[in-house]
A protein has these predicted regions:
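A residue-level marker of the well-folded mature domains of exported/periplasmic proteins
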Residues: 2-360
Length: 360
């Protein structure tokens, strides 16, 4: 549980999903938004982390029974308990992230157009892939994650069509239960299989499982020409002038290309820094930003200011609810002319000139 602040402060309960608040991704982003609200708005933050899937939702009821001012459910798996509890506790305000509750009077449903942000990171991957093969690593095989896959695939294909090349997207999922969000070992196995098929950039939308991909990429570092499967070859070398970490040459040799991951939800670029030197090649290509931190913070702020409203709230490219990460860690991987191109694509999506699919 969080620390207790001033007696008059509003009490906010954060019920996390599978993976917990230190997953460096989805849940952690919500935790960071809550921490900022505690600092800026002088609210008390309490949290509940399930130790197994059967405990998901327990925190929601506990916070409601204690009369909290706002209860936030982090993840679609919390929707059922949020909806049931909200009907019973009409004086308590609720917010659910990544799902839509039919209980609109006192529940804010915070949803994201993940496909739009995924299109942009897919576009970047399509422009910079060195093999024409990229991977997608989903967590739980559900429609929510299919949106990430659909947008990513469409972005890759859009970029490759512009460049007159044929690209392949390899999709795999960790599993079909909530445990799929927290199984980095399985994600590592999938990453290895995608590498053997020639994937040089892999995008994970898998919560804590995505850390398995990140570990794998930093461990492997590259694809070697001798290991490429039949029909796959190096088609370009966009990173040849980027200084490599000291151990790259000995591990990879000359006839190789670096391998990259694309992070998700939070900015995970920094996790690709293998030698604590942002000036050398970073294995984090970019991250699809899903501003769960902003959604969490804004919900708390609305309660503090008395402007809270139930119902659907949509976060998209148009309101910076999703996007892509560019920072000191990956600036050498995405040149200025490509930034201009992806920004133009972003505007085309916002203006409806490009329609991004939601389904695979």
């Amino acid at each position: 549980m969080g620390e207790v602040g001033q007696a008059q402060a509003l009490r906010i309960g954060i019920a996390f999903g599978e993976g917990g608040k230190n997953d460096r991704s989805f849940n952690q982003s919500a935790a960071e938004g809550a921490a900022k609200a505690k600092e800026d708005l002088q609210v008390e933050i309490f949290d509940f982390e399930p130790t197994d899937p059967s405990q998901i939702g327990q925190g929601v009821r506990k916070f409601a029974e204690e009369g909290f001012d706002l209860v936030v459910g982090v993840g679609f798996a919390l929707e059922a308990s949020i909806t049931t509890t909200a009907k019973e506790f009409q004086d308590v305000k609720f917010a659910v992230i990544d799902s839509v509750s039919p209980e609109e009077s006192n529940v804010a449903s915070l949803v994201f157009r993940e496909q739009e942000g995924s299109f942009l990171v897919g576009y970047l991957a399509g422009k910079q892939t060195q093999t024409g093969v990229v991977g997608f690593l989903g967590g739980m095989d559900i429609p929510l994650i299919h949106r990430f896959e659909a947008g990513y695939r469409a972005g890759v294909e859009y970029a490759c069509k512009e460049d007159g090349i044929t690209c392949k997207v390899i999709p795999n999922y960790v599993g079909t239960t909530p445990a799929a969000w927290n199984d980095p070992a399985k994600a590592k196995e999938i990453s290895a299989a995608q590498q053997t098929q020639g994937a040089d950039i892999i995008y994970a939308a898998a919560g804590g499982s995505g850390l398995g991909l990140i570990d794998f990429v930093k461990q492997e570092k590259c694809l070697k020409a001798a290991d490429l499967p039949s029909g796959v070859s190096f088609i370009r070398d966009p990173f040849k002038d980027v200084p490599k970490p000291a151990d790259y040459a000995s591990a990879c040799g000359e006839d190789s290309r670096p391998m990259f991951f694309i992070g998700v939800d939070a900015n995970q670029n920094y996790l690709g820094d293998a030698d604590n030197n942002p000036e050398t090649l970073n294995y984090g290509f970019t991250s699809m930003l899903k501003r769960v931190d902003v959604a969490t913070y804004d919900s708390i702020k609305a309660v503090v200011e008395g402007t809270f409203k139930g119902g659907l709230q949509d976060f998209s490219l148009a309101n910076d609810g999703v996007g892509y990460a560019l920072d000191d860690f990956n600036k050498a991987l995405i040149p200025a002319d490509l930034i201009s191109k992806v920004e133009a694509v972003k505007q085309d999506i916002i203006q409806g000139k490009i329609t991004v699919p939601e389904n695979r």
